[in-house]
Curated annotation (Swiss-Prot):
Coiled-coil region list: none
Signal peptide limits: 1-18
Main function: Lysozymes have primarily a bacteriolytic function; those in tissues and body fluids are associated with the monocyte-macrophage system and enhance the activity of immunoagents.
EC number of this enzyme: 3.2.1.17
Protein name: Lysozyme C, intestinal isozyme
First-level EC class: hydrolase
Matches recorded under InterPro entries: Glyco_hydro_22, Glyco_hydro_22_CS, Glyco_hydro_22_lys, Lysozyme-like_dom_sf
Bridged cysteine pairs (disulfide): 24-145, 48-133, 83-99, 95-113
The keyword Hydrolase appears for this protein: yes
């Protein structure tokens, strides 16, 4: 019985850790999901954005006390506007998705939500992109990746 409990806890800890992508692994993944050039945004800009928001980590969350909302996952999808975490007051859930889906290793739903956001608001919806990527040479974010 103890062995089953320990195994269960180990499996739980694996799912809770999330995934921290390597640079080129994420670049290939985002390209495969069709983000390279999506709505005019280059792959290097998406890479800069995800580095600035989460350091390529699917498990990152950040609470925003002013809006009582939380940003989730590799793209830091906000619970007030884009996903439902069940606790953010007056949440809109523009992507029609649970915020917990933004924290998964499989970033399919996170990418779909990011596409929705950029389609409606443009890349400037992300503060990290405005502060760290806009009007900068972002080529280093994909340099060395065999794409």
């Amino acid at each position: 019985m103890k062995a089953v409990l320990i195994l269960g806890l180990l499996l739980l800890s694996v799912t809770v850790q999330g995934k921290k992508f390597e640079k080129c692994e994420l670049a290939r993944t985002l390209r495969r999901y069709g983000l390279d050039g999506y709505k005019g945004v280059s792959l290097a800009n998406w890479m800069c954005l995800t580095y600035g928001e989460s350091r390529y980590n699917t498990r990152v969350t950040n609470y925003n006390p002013g809006s009582k909302s939380t940003d989730y996952g590799i793209f830091q999808i906000n619970s007030k506007w884009w996903c439902n975490d069940g606790k953010t007051p007056k949440a809109v859930n523009g992507c029609g998705v649970s915020c917990s889906a933004m924290l998964k290793d499989d970033i399919t739903q996170a990418v779909a939500c990011a596409k929705t956001i950029v389609s409606r608001q443009g890349i400037t919806a992300w503060v990290a992109w405005k502060n760290k990527c806009r009007n900068r040479d972002v080529s280093s974010y994909i340099r060395g990746c065999k794409l």
